[in-house]
Regions:
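Short loop segments at secondary-structure junctions
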Residues: 37-39, 64-68, 81-84, 108-116
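A generic structural signal for beta-strand entry/edge sites
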Residues: 38-42, 58, 102
Length: 188
């Protein structure tokens, strides 16, 4: 709640910190942990590929808060850049995202108040990471759909330029027509 006014007034820049070196955002490979100690939380781990990280003054850090029978629970914490034990590190070069600078962070016994928890305990993966994965999947699918549409148009052009279509070609043109309707229906 302390950060909300600054966020709404544009005084804070925030960076989501999920991905880790060698793990990406895969939940089984993440290792950053948050340990509760009374009214405080102690964070240890590393994060990477932090979009706008060099500009951020607040990090939303997803960390493991429980593990039972191989299943991990993740919680997100608001961590100020000025926190003792938070070190900005270099990130791999991401040339295609040049307008958005990237960095990594190393967390060594970073202490924040437990009230810096964002959302319910153990719900960060479902509330934050899964929706982000869906957006990433959708963005990846658009590239494939665009390429598919381009190839489809080339195929249609080639098929309609045949002077004397055979019965086999007419069948192929019919299938192309059905594909065109299906692609149109899904917005490709």
């Amino acid at each position: 709640a302390d950060y909300l006014p600054g966020l709404t007034e544009g005084r804070h820049t925030v960076c989501m910190a999920i991905s880790e070196p060698g793990a990406g955002a895969h939940p089984k490979k993440l290792s950053t942990r948050a340990e509760f100690d009374g009214d405080k939380v102690i964070l240890n781990g590393q994060k990477t590929y932090l979009t706008n990280g060099p500009l951020a003054d607040l990090f939303l850090i997803m960390a493991i808060t429980a593990e039972l029978d191989g299943r991990r629970s993740f919680t997100t914490f608001i961590v100020p850049k000025s926190s003792e034990g938070l070190e900005i590190t270099e990130s791999a070069t991401v040339d295609f995202l040049h307008p958005s600078p990237h960095c990594g962070i190393k967390l060594t016994n970073v202490v924040v108040p437990a009230v810096n928890r964002l959302g319910p305990l153990g719900d960060a993966f479902n509330a934050i990471s899964l929706p982000m994965r869906r957006v990433e999947d959708a963005l990846s699918a658009t590239k494939s759909a665009g390429a598919m549409r381009h190839r489809f148009r080339l195929l249609c052009r080639a098929a309609t330029n045949i002077a004397d279509p055979t019965a086999e070609m007419e069948g192929a043109l019919g299938r192309l027509s059905v594909m065109a309707e299906a692609m149109s229906a899904i917005g490709v």
